[in-house]
Swiss-Prot record:
Protein name per the record: Elongation factor 4
Keywords in alphabetical order: Cell inner membrane, Cell membrane, GTP-binding, Hydrolase, Membrane, Nucleotide-binding, Protein biosynthesis
Pfam families named among the record's database cross-references: EFG_C, GTP_EFTU, GTP_EFTU_D2, LepA_C
Taxonomic source organism: Prochlorococcus marinus subsp. pastoris (strain CCMP1986 / NIES-2087 / MED4)
Lineage: Bacteria, Bacillati, Cyanobacteriota, Cyanophyceae, Synechococcales
Subcellular location, principal: membrane
Amino acid sequence: MTDISVSKIRNFCIIAHIDHGKSTLADRLLQDTGTVKQRDMQDQFLDSMDLERERGITIKLQAARMKYKAKDSQEYILNLIDTPGHVDFSYEVSRSLQACEGALLVVDASQGVEAQTLANVYLALENNLEIIPVLNKVDLPGADAEKIKQEIEEIIGLDTSNAINCSAKTGEGIEDILEAVVSRIPHPQNEVKSLTKALIFDSYYDPYRGVIVYFRVIAGSINKKDKILLMASKKNYELDEIGIMAPDEKQVNELHAGEVGYLAASIKSVADARVGDTITLFNSPAKDPLPGYKTANPMVFCGLFPTDADQYPDLRESLEKLQLSDAALKYEPETSSAMGFGFRCGFLGLLHMEIVQERLEREYDLDLIVTAPSVIYKVNLNDQEDILIDNPSTIPDPQSRESIEEPYVKMEIYSPNEFNGTLMGLCQERRGVFIDMKYITTDRVTLIYEIPLAEVVTDFFDQMKSRTQGYASMEYHLIGYRKNDLVRLDVLINSERADPLTSIVHKDKAYGIGRGLVEKLKELIPKQQFKIPIQASIGSRIIASESISALRKDVLSKCYGGDISRKKKLLKKQAKGKKRMKAMGKVDVPQEAFMAVLKLNQ
């Protein structure tokens, strides 16, 4: 395996928006090069999680090595590195792009360029990759390849005179793509003699062998007898095995510059072998690591609580296991008077949050309550100190703070221009600041807004899709913090604060949200033997209030006529009992109430 010259290697990835046919194209390439035999083939071969196949998205990166005999009768090694297309995983995308020399830009010939495609194309251009435009799904009746080519030229500025028309479904154009990969994508630089450096572009946790690391050798070579050093985590390991993905793992003795492979070295957790870290040799380490490494910081936080308190240890264990394979997931224990014991978790974004929640419920059989997602706020205290807070219920009282700052994102929304008005309305409702509007083609438009992240992480995406019949797509990145007139909205049930329902809202919206919350809770909390006040408050000021009337037992049913003082005595006794009950009684808020309110909160 090691006598391949570097000039015969091509490393490439596929860039595409969700649903533009990336995984199907990858399947077809694996099939046509004979990498995967027909009988082993299943749809979305590289998407290894069931959840990925169901949602039709790629979450974890995969890689596959293909042998291809080109028309010049030379045999080439093609390494396909799969990338996730979703904005939450953009750091993983940027690392896998760094492991390539070229990219196939796949655009759906019936839909055109979408937001995610653009975000990843710009990442690819920053990494100086050779980009080959591919128009997929040309067999569909609505496909208009020429119009889409024009769109690619206008929006991205790529020359599409040699773009390839293909249909991953029927197999049309697949041969042209393979030839283009060989002829147009440059081979890796020949740095076999340099000090060893390899880039980690993915890793996953295997319960038997520890963490399996996928890497691309940038310079030098790695032998299976070597001792390696990871430059960011400063840990060293003896190698157990190295190999290639074809696409099943296959052991080899050595990998050289330009090659892509995997290694196992009894690494305990994915956090020790982070995506973007540099592998070098322990005995002759490289001076500088490869550029661009950063730790992924969570942007969205929420509380996870088991519906059954006995499941708390299981939840902790499953989060520990998940973290072994998902280094971006952060969590710490949290308790709440209303929900009991649980965890405060941090995620890269909303999709990441949903996926973690779904994996916990599916793979570990847990039943969870998820509190409303929140973001990191910066609180300026009176003593000029700034603190970062990810849980609204821990924000200090108004007396001890000067102001609250919230994160803003710059958002680009791509959509057919007939939905312009509804989208602008949506952005304005969400406190967005209009920046620019560009016509991409005569009938497609880009809206650029600066908008608070907190308004995006709830249901912005769903709203955008439903108002545009699913045609709009969006892309956003963080641009910093801004001061706003924000307040902490508490909900008091029987004068006790319900932490999971605490939220940070803009002062102008506080009354409406508070009103909605107390009305919803009134419907959902069952009556008790005593009257329950439900209040929404900002600091010590109550802004909305409702009360649930008490259940009454008819204590006068035994009195037939007779003296009024007897009846008064019984009613007085009942009132006294209710008063004592109200002082001692605890209101159990049913879980459905929390769930319904969280939806409303969003």
